[in-house]
From Swiss-Prot:
Molecular function terms, GO-annotated: dynein complex binding; microtubule plus-end binding
Name assigned to this protein: Nuclear distribution protein PAC1
Lineage, broadest ranks: Eukaryota, Fungi, Dikarya, Ascomycota, Pezizomycotina
Cytoplasm found in the keyword field: yes
Main location as per UniProt: cytoplasm
Gene Ontology CC, one term: kinetochore
Coiled-coil intervals: 60-87
InterPro entries in the record: Dynein_regulator_LIS1, G-protein_beta_WD-40_rep, LIS1_N, LisH, PAC1-like_LisH-like_dom, WD40/YVTN_repeat-like_dom_sf, WD40_repeat_CS, WD40_repeat_dom_sf
Organism: Phaeosphaeria nodorum (strain SN15 / ATCC MYA-4574 / FGSC 10173) (Glume blotch fungus)
PANTHER family attached to this UniProt entry: WD REPEAT-CONTAINING PROTEIN POP1
Similarity remark: Belongs to the WD repeat LIS1/nudF family.
Length: 462
């Protein structure tokens, strides 16, 4: 057993077996087992209660996973048969280009379990797991492909305001922040155990994002997390130590949202002072202030390089910025019901009007052609950057109440980028641009998750 299980795992298994033998009223067998495995640890009522039912749960989990694997194998076999019998011409006709896919009603899944409004959602970068946070103080982990609840994560004492997956390569973590003034880190590989709590903010922590690798000049790539708070500050944390390594001040009021650039060099924040601000993540110095909204700015996002060509055309530029550069364009959404697109120097490029209530979430389409927004008017709107930002699609009644959050499933990453590469499969030198564009399209996952005051999380997928 020692060759398969660690000492800790073996001890946990022994406790679960002893608890199970107690449940089925087999004290002699339990005593014999304890003697056989030389189990001398105390086993009081609290320990017994903790481990009762664990063995049965593990067993049913294995059966459930076996069933899921079987279903996936059958589905894969069916799809492969269909693919083998389909000609390339008809395949192109039947399958929509993922770079042009937009969400449509009805949702594939409506996920129900939260008891209070949903405030945030986040996709696991690899697995089909989705985290949702709520004012009910819990985080729910879902399988978004199957539409099933996997577990409920508890630990915060007030509403959960944001969640995000990220962290060091090969060691994905889930981060959450709350009105209880704390940030918590959870380990998905260990049943979402709370591995660290980060105190330090003096008011509600509104938003968190893992900072992509290589940020802030840190040699420990992927270890940084940025948070935004009602205490008017941004804080940068090292998740390996739990220490705050930088506090960024400049906003005059509640900071509602924060978004890092793809390379981690820049941080974009905004909030109740009706401004958005771009910061150098390494020095904490302000690069630019975006002025123009007439109400609180609820959400911000930095445009990915794949959208540069379309945004440069929208801005009237002769040629787009190099794909290796970051924070060239940004978008902001406000309670004034508008979305504004800016260049990285603070020049307003376009104002998108159409929502009838607060704009609560923004995401750039991974294909680079669209900007999507979610609003308290219950809709999702899709804006075409190649058509002067015209609204080309509205998902009406996406929810029955205010849509509070929206995230796009991250692209499937097949190969690590080489030096000079930007995300979404594009290269700085353009040597293999066509090949990279095809690879980027193939990696797009046409899946969006939204959360709402109506207590529902919805999955929109192709």
């Amino acid at each position: 057993m020692s060759a398969i299980l660690t000492d800790r795992q073996a001890e946990e298994l022994h406790k679960a077996i002893i608890a199970y033998l107690g449940v089925i009223n087999a004290p002699k067998t339990a005593a014999a087992f304890r003697e056989e495995v030389n189990f001398s640890a105390a086993f009081d009522d609290a320990t017994r209660k903790k481990y009762e039912g664990l063995l049965e749960k593990k067993w049913t989990s294995v059966v459930r996973l076996q069933k899921k694997v079987l279903e996936l194998e059958q589905r894969n076999q069916s799809l492969q048969s269909e693919l083998d019998s389909t000609t390339p011409t008809s395949l192109l006709r039947r399958n929509q280009d993922p770079s042009s896919w937009l969400p449509r009603a009805p949702a594939r899944h409506t996920l129900q379990s939260h008891r209070s409004p949903i405030t945030c959602v986040a996709f696991h970068p690899v697995f089909s797991s989705l985290a949702s946070g709520s004012e009910d103080t819990t985080i729910k982990i879902w399988d978004w492909e199957l539409g099933e609840l996997e577990r409920t994560v508890k630990g915060h004492t007030k509403g959960v305001l944001d969640v995000d997956f990220g962290g060091p390569r090969g060691g994905t973590l889930l981060a959450s922040c709350s009105s209880d003034l704390t940030i918590k880190l959870w380990d998905p590989s260990d049943e979402y155990k709370n591995i660290r709590t980060l105190p330090g903010h003096d008011h509600s922590v509104s938003a968190i994002r893992f900072v992509p690798s290589g940020a802030a000049g840190s040699p420990s790539s992927g270890n940084l997390l940025v948070s935004a708070s009602r205490d008017k500050t941004l804080r940068v944390w090292d998740v390996t130590t739990g220490y705050c390594v930088k506090t960024i001040r400049g906003h005059a009021d509640w900071v509602r949202d924060v978004s890092p650039s793809f390379d981690g060099r820049w941080l974009l924040s905004a909030g109740n002072d009706q401004t958005a601000r771009l910061w150098d993540a390494s020095s904490g110095e302000a690069k630019c202030t975006f002025l123009g909204h007439e109400h609180v700015i609820e959400c911000v996002t930095i445009a990915p390089p794949v959208s540069y060509a379309n945004l440069a055309s929208l801005a009237g530029l002769k040629k787009p910025p190099p794909l290796s550069s970051s924070a060239e364009f940004v978008a902001t959404g406000s309670r004034d019901k508008t979305i504004k697109i800016w260049d990285g120097r603070g020049t307003l490029i376009k104002t998108l009007a159409g929502h009838d209530n607060w704009v609560r979430a923004l995401i750039f389409h991974p294909g680079g052609k669209y900007l999507l927004s979610a609003s308290d008017d219950k809709t999702i709107r899709c804006w075409d950057l190649t058509q002067e930002g015209r609204c080309v699609k509205v998902v009406t009644d996406a929810h029955s109440h205010f849509v509070s959050c929206m995230r796009w499933a991250p692209n499937v990453v097949k190969d690590a980028p080489t030096n000079g590469d930007a995300p979404n499969g594009t290269t700085a030198n353009g040597a293999s641009k066509k090949k990279d564009e095809e690879s980027a399209k193939a990696g797009i996952r046409c899946v969006i998750a939204t959360g709402c005051v109506d207590l529902n999380v919805r999955i929109f997928a192709s």
